[in-house]
Amino acid sequence: MIKKTILFLSIFLISTNFVYAKETVTFSECVDGDTFKILVDNKEYSIRMLAIDTPESVHPQKGVEYYGKEASEYTCNKVKNATKLEIEYDPNEDKTDKYGRLLVWVFVDGELLQKNLVANGYAKIGYLYEDYIYTSELE
């Protein structure tokens, strides 16, 4: 019985690592400072970066907020010029939001983009509903 339990736990732990592993993607289109589009197998998806909020640059009700365009341009330049663009789902969050956007951590050439945006003043930490895997890196 113990051997079966150990085998089951080993398989479970290995499989969860594959589910939430980083996935290399292709940049498609800029939207704003915390949202952009990617291609995966020739299908386009909208990305919403977890745990941060940038000033709005295209919001229909809020309009353009202070530093919204700068945050959007900074993010766009980072993802558009990335040699390697990767996303990673968080095991403590849904994969999509109510708008159908993928909720992910974003890595540009191995660097956590959310951390970069916060450190450079383009984003603030926000929308922390769970204990996310990279939250401590943002502080």
Predicted regions and their residues:
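Small beta-barrel nucleic-acid-binding modules, primarily SNase/OB-fold domains
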Residues: 2-10, 17-139
